[in-house]
Amino acid sequence: MDLKGGKPDESSLADGGPQVERPNIFHTISAEKTKHWCYHAVANVIRAHSLICSFPEADADRTVITEISWGGFLTSVVSGLDHRFKASVSVYGCSYIYKNGPWLAKFQAMSDSDRQHWIELYDPSQYLGSCQTRIFFVNGTTDFAYLPDIYEQSYQLIKGERNFQLTVEMGLGQPQG
C-alpha cells in the first residue's frame, strides 16, 4: 500500500485516491468518503489482497498482512474487515489515536459530529473487535505517535489470538520495525 496512491515510480494512479498528507486524513471528514484518504487506503489494501490471492503462485490460505506506522494503523483496520488473512502484524499502529498522541489537537479542533464521524468510519477501535486472525502488535516505548496507553487499549479489543512486543527505546522506521 502506497501512502500517496502512486505507482513504484511515484506517479499517481488514476484511482489511487488522495495522498496521506495531514489535511486528507482529518480535515476532509465532512466531504463524501470517496474523498477520504483512509477510505481509499483500506480499500486498496483489500483489493491488493484479492489480487494476490488470485495468483496461482500465491497460497491464499497463508496470507499475512503487515505494515508500519500509518500502515500499521491501516493493518489494524483491515484486520477487522478482511478475514482471509491468517496473521496480522501491526507495527507502530493502533486505535484510539483521538484519545492520546500527536493528533489529539486535530481531533479537539473538530466539531463533535465530525470527530464522532471520523471515529466511526476510521478508528481501528471500530474494527479490531471483529478481528478473526492472529494479530501481533509491535511498538516501542518512545514512539511519538502510538503511545503505550492507547496501544494497550487496542490490544484489549482483540477477542482471539493476540500478542505484542513493546521494545524499550525502539526507533521509528522500516529497519527497526
Residue ranges of each PLM-predicted region?
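Cap/lid segment of the alpha/beta-hydrolase catalytic domain
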Residues: M1-A43, I97-K106
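Structural recognition of the beta-strand scaffold that forms the well-ordered cores
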Residues: M1-D2, V64-T66, A87-S90, F136-F137, ...
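Solvent-exposed loop/turn segments at secondary-structure junctions
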Residues: G5-P8, S95-Y96, T142-F144, M170-L172
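Primarily recognizes the serine-hydrolase "nucleophile elbow" in alpha/beta-hydrolase
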Residues: I46-H117, T142
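Loop/turn elements at helix/coil->beta-strand transitions in domains of secreted/extracellular proteins
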Residues: A60-D61, H83-A87, Q132-R134, K159-N163
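Active-site nucleophile elbow and catalytic-triad environment of alpha/beta-hydrolase enzymes
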Residues: S113-Y127
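Short beta-strand/loop motif that positions the catalytic acidic residue
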Residues: C131, F137-N139, D143
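Catalytic cores of secreted or luminal carbohydrate-active enzymes
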Residues: P148-G177
